Curated annotation (Swiss-Prot):
The keyword Manganese applies. Belongs to the BPG-independent phosphoglycerate mutase family. The lineage of its organism: Bacteria, Pseudomonadati, Pseudomonadota, Gammaproteobacteria, Enterobacterales. Mn(2+) 1 binds at residues 403, 407, 463. It comes from Enterobacter sp. (strain 638). The gene is gpmI. This is 2,3-bisphosphoglycerate-independent phosphoglycerate mutase.
Length: 514
């Protein structure tokens, strides 16, 4: 009979940052007796989850993709944002063969260069500076028809902040004397990741056919009209931008389409609508044979050229476990399932040997303030069963509530989400202790601890650059080390499990045996 395993469990409370000021702080204002007691009585510390400590630009807020890559890799992983910033600064971006090849092919055939992406300074899914560089590259290489299809943010940026970005691009096109903003639409439609194809279809039709609910002469006018309709950036409806006498920007066979988002999860659905021959998310009214370029690899099964292929990461926590014949479980809801699997494994889609996965469906609601508990009850039930099964050496779980409800900007809902999490943590900690296992509780970045922007008074829907908690629950008598970061978690787990740390992991263990 096999011996029951005592699992090393990592619970990631998504968007659960640490901030001592109680003002607009959903975590502080929630009733959290369990987390309060654990923080008071167990070994704990604060760790960095943003900026240079996770391979992002200095003081850049953290995010879920970056957080999970660092958590699983056990080393600082330089993110696409930082990599692209450097490429543009050193001008190697302007000679990237995939990008220049697509532009040159369109130019020589007299075709258009379409550029789409999230027009945002948020730096989570994209950065407008990269899009600006792409526009400049297309113009420098002789493209006459340059069409920008702008997805508006308001989620990783303040809810109404797109005007200055759109103005920057309208000014740039005026300066170049060619090209224009051809369409605007909120990311709610263009960047869905939950198979809500009715939303994606509106973005697809807008770009392929130049057909939308609204049409305006300029992007700024289109945005102001959306605000007058009470639509924040994220929810701006499909709007064609075309002045009297301007050519239609509908896509044609042979045009280039360059997708400037660097984060994969919200880029996949719209990409598949453009490139998959067997696409069945919705009936496409117009199928265009485009020269489609993805900035980074959105998924291994999307077979189009990629300007910046992933750098492979050897010996992530998942791979190291598999090499040592350890069993592991990854478990989360739909919203963060990719994070505990694909991202935690360093961008590897295929599960490792001995790696099981459990996906709990996130509730089908328009926005998660309507159901702040999300699917946490079912997630906890499955997680507790896995902990007590004796089957797993390590379990990685993500609770999305703090982040997904934090993004809505609704304080009462975020408080409810945090209180729900407290109840879940109680059950998980009890289960771990009942089998003599070990538990680390942490977060990938902050969000719910800052629900209002003090400078603007608007709802704060974005992530923060604040530290996150790390708490140990288990039988070992440990002392916490200060100054940690997300990439120290994997080495910490290995140390607690009595395993060797691979040389690729440069993180340090954050608890020492007293």
């Amino acid at each position: 009979m096999s011996v029951s395993k005592k699992p090393m469990v990592l619970v990631i409370l998504d968007g659960y940052g640490y901030r001592e000021d109680s003002q607009d702080n959903a975590i502080f204002n929630a009733k959290t007796p369990v987390m309060d007691a654990l923080w008071a009585q167990r070994p704990h510390t604060l760790i960095d989850a943003s900026g240079l400590e996770v391979g992002l630009p200095d003081r850049q807020m953290g995010n879920s993709e970056v957080g999970h890559v660092n958590l699983g890799a056990g080393r600082i992983v330089y993110q696409d944002l930082t990599r692209l910033d450097v490429e543009i600064k050193e001008r190697t971006f302007f000679s990237n063969p995939t990008l220049t090849g697509a532009v040159d092919k369109a130019v020589s055939a007299g075709k258009a260069v379409h550029i789409m992406g999230l027009l945002s300074a948020g730096g989570v899914h994209s950065h407008e500076d990269h899009i600006l560089a792409m526009v400049e590259m297309a113009a420098e290489r002789g493209a006459e028809k340059i069409y920008l299809h702008a997805f508006l943010d308001g989620r990783d940026t303040p809810p109404r902040s797109a005007k200055s970005s759109l103005q920057t691009f309208e000014d740039k096109f005026a300066e170049l004397g060619k090209g224009r903003v051809a369409s605007i639409i909120g990311r709610y439609y263009a960047m869905d990741r939950d198979n809500r194809w009715d939303r994606v279809e509106q973005a697809y039709d807008l770009m392929t056919m130049a057909k939308g609910e609204f049409q305006f002469d300029t992007a700024v006018a289109g945005l102001e009209a959306a605000y007058a309709r009470d639509e924040n950036d994220e929810f701006v409806k499909a709007t064609v931008i075309r002045a009297e006498g301007q050519a239609d920007a509908a896509m044609e066979d042979g045009d280039a389409l360059i997708f400037m988002n660097f984060r994969a999860d919200r880029a996949r659905e719209i990409t598949r609508a453009f490139v998959n021959a067997d696409f069945d998310g919705f009936a496409r009214k117009k199928v265009v044979n485009l020269n489609f370029i993805m900035l980074t690899e959105y998924a291994a099964d999307i077979k189009v050229p990629c300007a910046y292929p992933p750098a492979s990461l050897a010996n992530t926590l998942g791979e190291w476990m598999a090499k040592h014949d350890k069993t592991q479980l990854r478990i989360s809801e739909t919203e963060k399932y990719a994070h505990v699997t694909f991202f935690f494994n360093g961008g590897v889609e295929e599960p490792f040997k001995g790696e099981d996965r459990i996906l709990i469906n996130s509730p089908k609601v328009a926005t998660y303030d309507l159901q702040p508990e999300m699917s946490s009850a079912e997630l906890t039930e499955k997680l507790v069963a896995a902990i007590t099964s004796g089957k797993y050496d390590t379990i990685i779980c993500n609770y999305p509530n703090g982040d997904m409800v934090g993004h809505t900007g609704v304080m009462e809902a975020a408080v409810k989400a945090v209180e729900t999490l407290d109840h879940c943590v109680e059950q998980v900690a009890k289960a771990v202790e009942s089998v003599g296992g070990q538990l680390l509780i942490t977060a990938d970045h902050g969000n719910a601890e800052q629900m209002r922007d003090p400078s603007t008074g608007q709802a704060h829907t974005a992530h923060t650059n604040l530290p996150v908690p790390l708490i140990y629950v288990g039988e070992k008598s440990l002392k916490a080390v200060e100054g940690g970061k997300l990439s120290d978690i994997a080495p910490t787990m290995l140390t607690l499990m009595g395993m060797e740390i691979p040389k690729e992991m440069t993180g340090k263990p954050l608890f020492i045996v007293e």
